[in-house]
Amino acid sequence: GLVYTFTLRDGVKFHNGNDVTCEDVKYSLERAAGLLDGTPLVATLQTIQSVDILDDKTVQVTVDTPNTELIYSFVTAIIPAGSGEDAEANPVGTGPFSFVSYTPQEGIVLAKNENYWQEGLPYLDEVDFKIVGSADTALLELQGGSIDIYAYLTDSQANELKDSFNVISSPSNVVQALFLNNDYEPLS
């Protein structure tokens, strides 16, 4: 389709406690599409022609051409309107965890978002993402107990760990996609 209409969920707040508004959604999508400065941050959002606020809970996005990947691209982060450059140094979002710190070459620390919209989540108080230089180092850190999860095991690593760790595997080609046929109503 060429026009997408989104209704904001009630009770969604940013990590700083402020309500998420249509102005925030408009700003974030226009910024990501390059409508504010001519530099798109998300290539598939370049097709956005306009983002219009219909009322206090509804945003309408108009694109110039049908794009089967567009829906996937709407998962772009919604940030407070006008946050711009500050968004990189002091990120504020709506997810289950909020930014605490980032140390280059070491990792990022996130804390539980007490304002998260989905009741009962998150159930963890903190998540630490550790930057590890190689798969072999990550395997050693997992075995040594300094990390709890490692998502990208090779088959040989999984076999090595299966007797002492809960190794969960599933077939995947690492491609996840939803494509809509925009040649026919109601999506054309």
Give the predicted meaning of each segment.
Residues 1-3, 20, 46, 54-56, ...:
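Extracytoplasmic
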